[in-house]
């Protein structure tokens, strides 16, 4: 049983629910600043709750510290947890800068503990399928990637910089898993206070990728995501619409000399799959090849490249 201490009661409450669905974890303690909310959490989940963050990271029972704090606090408390002999599971992004992320990486090596970052997009069924399709090269060489997401203001502030850091970044993790870091980036965008549109063109040798994040949709519109992978001998395309009243997902593969294939997608929850992956890595004492600090740093590097071009 992996014993967990959670820092933060914003997205941390979502993590609490997720842990309750995955066997092998036990929540020991939760830190937050809102005493009323902490009381509700303690009663609902039968856990210890505190406004003293050190009570969680110093707790000898805690094996894994789950960080759901504001991004600017991620690296600080990841390092503090590592110093105290804890493994770390951190919400994405791991840090605000490559320098901070590298400090976390060095601390993990120094103290001999594992760092996992919630790069959940890699466990999304359609994205997993696309990644495997690209790696197997069954449709020939990969020529281009296009990925998009669109939303209304339901996620709060997604102005230009916040868009790149908290919305655009999921697509970045997807593309980096397939193609690695680009040689250069050209980004453009339009900023409307707490809303924005960001388009990034990623340049590789013999490959292009275009990412677009739009947080300007009216509130009546559904959340949309999708991607298209262009191969020498075919195209793989996924489009999804998520609305309060309906959902629609479609994954099509079109290849030379073959009938169009509608891919049947498993209904796995990518967030639960992340926890199962972490559990396996900790039980087997192996490093993650998908969501470790090394993979997370690549995402932070790409974010800095995009922001440098954009701002």
Question: What feature does the model see in each segment?
Answer:
Residues 51, 90, 115-117, 238:
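Hydrophobic residues in well-ordered beta-strands that form the structural core
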Residues 47, 84-86, 111-113, 206-207:
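A short helix->loop->beta-strand "cap" motif at the edges of active sites that frequently abuts
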Residues 166-244, 275-285:
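Contiguous beta-strand/loop segments that form the cofactor/metal-binding neighborhood of enzyme cores
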Residues 227-229, 244-257:
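Short polybasic amphipathic segments
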Residues 1-45, 279:
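N-terminal Rossmann-like dinucleotide-binding module
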Residues 95-155:
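A contiguous active-site-proximal alpha/beta segment in oxidoreductase catalytic domains
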Residues 15, 45-105:
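Beta-loop-alpha module in the N-terminal Rossmann-like domain of NAD(P)-dependent dehydrogenases
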Residues 55, 64-69, 110-113, 263, ...:
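C-terminal helix-rich "cap/oligomerization" subdomain common to oxidoreductases
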